[in-house]
From Swiss-Prot:
GO molecular function, one term: endonuclease activity
Full protein name: Polymerase acidic protein
Family per similarity comment: Belongs to the influenza viruses PA family.
Domain of life: Viruses
Organism: Influenza A virus (strain A/Turkey/Wisconsin/1/1966 H9N2)
HAMAP family associated with the record: INFV_PA (MF_04063)
Extent of motif Nuclear localization signal 2 (NLS2): 184-247
GO biological process, one term: symbiont-mediated suppression of host gene expression
Cofactor(s) the protein needs: Mn(2+)
Length: 716
């Protein structure tokens, strides 16, 4: 091969190639294929520039004879082939005189007519794969890319080929000749296979050993290597290449790439039907707390003691009665269950020593509410495998529900500030490194914005309830244990406060698998009259249990106090995640942090302080039918936190599906906004996948309606 190179190429080109290789510590005698590739590339660059001039009128002309006309200026500046220092000097001087953006990598030519740098590529592989690698490396809109292959194909940025047909034909003919010459000497195959992908500094991450073998084994058919596949995947250009590729890969696939324009997307279709109902494990905005300040009673911190103490702060109890029955339930049983709780709490007080936990008597009303003996008997498969008509229960399709306004109100409420702090700042040691100092500063600013947020109250309430329920489920499997729903906070003045929201009674809980269900009955205090939005409370039986005196601007008013009772269930895995709800704080902090980082990298200094302290600046919070909503940085923190908390409270398969599928549509719309000219195939299928998740879940329906607002404003 070395002999061939020295015979085939002009001695000046050979010398430049040797010099270039030596600069990188490579030996032309050993790396002969690389030697040939560099010579070829140099020759193409020179041929690209040959005979092209700019006349005195600034027009591009072709002059092939040795016309000694001094007024002609070379159209192209050749950068390739110079030593690095000289090459960068030329590039800098061009940038200074023309104002063109300075490229990150050394380009090959500069075109004085079009005022742009040109990156020339010569490839033994497919032009579009090599083009994408180049584009990936260059990462600049300003540098023009032009790729030639040894088979006569070419590809250039925006299909703008710079040169006339004849000049390009000359280059293609020369490349074809080189290929023929190599083939006749038996050198072509080795040369063709030796081409490596473009390396960029940041992507020189090698996968080796077992991981490499696994990667190569798991490639789709028709791909020889991981690099090949990577380039192919990165290379989505909606110009026809991909349709051909898809049809090569499978006869069943025929994808027509459709351009995605402002008029393409339609709004998501939300389901019709009765309004959706509340399905959280505990009440949110409607919860009412019975509280004690500065608790110092005997046994303080033991939930049952705290609960009894809180119950004693209220004097307005009255004979309970059902005000909103549960359509499908036996409502008198819910009433009896509450009366039983009151009676058994009274019994505890009459005892000399209050116990630490309370197991309820297994009355008929509790057995009914907790589904005791309701589970079908389990039969060993061996005993029934011969039954001819063995089949699974038919299950009904879920009934579609429409979006109701209460879920938006719930979300708004979760973003609000309360008058208590729900977060104790953990003591973390002194900062040692500067990065720790920045981290502490960010954490402290963020905490200040969210510690009083209602979403933080929901986190603490969720953590407490799930921890207590999981503990009881393991410690008292067969008992109907009474579990108070408690939270702790600090008032504005810094006084400690213990709150009681109501009670849970747990059913039998022999939880072997993560998904085994434990039933529980929840009984929660509230001042919300259920008759105002009966559809929200479909799953509840609501009792009126007392009258509460409230201080208002016009003096004291008496309001009825309600008890929201329902049967519910959860599993080990759900309780485990519920116990980890504090992660929501971390997730929203990270989202805020990425906003700070973006700001800091623009300003080239840490912007944490300015970010939180510049009260005049507003930030986008979300979309509503009115347009993009904006607010203070504190509001952004609380909104992000509330979203994260609701994702946890309303976790469901519908949410998983909606998030994953709608994200794809979101990315396409973002690409359109960024003027990246996205193309799609089977957009109808994507809409189907998204809309199949819009059934009856209130949080998913709300997110879908927000998504529609976003579509409207993004595509204006």
């Amino acid at each position: 091969m070395e002999d061939f190179v020295r015979q085939c190429f002009n001695p000046m080109i050979v010398e430049l190639a040797e010099k270039a290789m030596k600069e990188y510590g490579e030996d032309p005698k050993i790396e002969t294929n690389k030697f040939a590739a560099i010579c070829t590339h140099l020759e193409v660059c020179f041929m690209y520039s040959d005979f092209h001039f700019i006349d005195e009128r600034g027009e591009s002309i072709i002059v092939e004879s040795g016309d000694p006309n001094a007024l002609l200026k070379h159209r192209f500046e050749i950068i390739e082939g110079r030593d690095r220092t000289m090459a960068w000097t030329v590039v800098n001087s061009i940038c200074n005189t023309t104002g063109v953006e300075k490229p990150k990598f050394l380009p090959d030519l500069y075109d004085y007519k079009e005022n742009r740098f040109i990156e020339i590529g010569v490839t033994r592989r497919e032009v579009h794969i090599y083009y994408l690698e180049k584009a990936n490396k260059v990462k600049s809109e300003k540098t023009h890319i032009h790729i030639f292959s040894f088979t006569g194909e070419e590809m250039a940025t925006k299909a703008d080929y710079t040169l006339d047909e004849e000049s390009r034909a000359r280059i293609k003919t020369r490349l074809f000749t080189i290929r023929q010459e190599m083939a006749s000497r038996g050198l072509w195959d080795s040369f063709r296979q030796s081409e490596r992908g473009e390396e960029t500094i940041e992507e020189r991450f090698e996968i080796t050993g077992t991981m490499r073998r696994l990667a190569d084994q798991s490639l789709p058919p028709n791909f020889s290597s991981l690099e090949n596949f990577r380039a192919y995947v990165d290379g989505f250009e909606p110009n026809g290449c991909i349709e051909g590729k898809l049809s090569q890969m499978s006869k069943e696939v025929n994808a027509r790439i459709e351009p995605f324009l402002k008029t393409t997307p339609r709004p998501l279709k939300l389901p019709d039907g009765p309004p959706c109902s509340q399905r959280s494990k505990f009440l949110l905005m409607d919860a009412l707390k019975l509280s004690i300040e500065d608790p110092s009673h005997e046994g303080e911190g033991i939930p049952l003691y705290d609960a009894i103490k809180c119950m004693k702060t209220f004097f307005g109890w009255k004979e309970p009665n059902v005000v909103k029955p549960h359509e499908k339930g036996i409502n008198p049983n819910y009433l009896l269950a509450w009366k039983q709780v009151l009676a058994e709490l009274q019994d505890i007080e009459n005892e000399e020593k209050i116990p630490k936990t309370k197991n309820m008597k297994k009355t008929s009303q509790l057995k009914w509410a907790l589904g005791e003996n309701m589970a079908p008997e389990k039969v060993d498969f061996e005993d029934c495998k011969d039954v001819s008509d063995l089949k699974q229960y038919d299950s009904d399709e879920p009934e579609p529900r429409s979006l109701a306004s209460w879920i938006q109100s719930e979300f708004n409420k979760a973003c609000e500030l309360t008058d208590s702090s729900w977060m104790e700042l953990d003591e973390i040691g002194e900062d040692v490194a500067p990065i720790e100092h920045i981290a502490s500063m960010r954490r402290n600013y963020f905490t200040a914005e969210v510690s009083h947020c209602r979403a933080t109250e929901y986190i603490m309430k969720g953590v407490y309830i799930n921890t207590a329920l999981l503990n009881a489920s393991c410690a008292a499997m067969d008992d109907f244990q009474l579990i108070p729903m408690i939270s702790k906070c600090r008032t504005k003045e810094g006084r400690r406060k213990t709150n009681l929201y109501g009670f849970i009674i747990k059913g039998r809980s022999h939880l072997r698998n993560d998904t085994d269900v434990v039933n529980f009955v929840s009984m929660e205090f509230s001042l919300t009259d259920p008759r105002l939005e009966p559809h929200k409370w479909e799953k509840y039986c609501v009792l009126e249990i007392g009258d509460m005196l409230l201080r208002t601007a016009i003096g004291q008013v008496s309001r009825p106090m309600f008890l929201y009772v329902r049967t519910n269930g959860t599993s080990k895995i759900k309780m485990k995640w519920g116990m980890e709800m504090r992660r929501c704080l971390l997730q929203s902090l990270q989202q805020i942090e990425s906003m700070i980082e973006a700001e800091s990298s623009v300003k080239e200094k840490d912007m944490t302080k300015e970010f939180f302290e510049n009260k005049s600046e507003t930030w986008p919070i979300g979309e509503s039918p009115k347009g993009v909503e904006e607010g203070s940085i504190g509001k952004v923190c609380r909104t992000l936190l509330a979203k994260s908390v609701f994702n946890s409270l309303y976790a469901s398969p519908q949410l998983e599906g909606f998030s994953a599928e709608s994200r794809k549509l979101l990315l396409i719309v973002q690409a359109l906004r960024d003027k990246l000219e996205p193309g799609t195939f089977d957009l109808g299928g994507l809409y189907e996948a998204i809309e199949e998740c819009l059934i009856n879940d209130p949080w998913v329906l709300l997110n879908a309606s927000w998504f529609n607002s976003f579509l409207t404003h993004a595509l204006r």
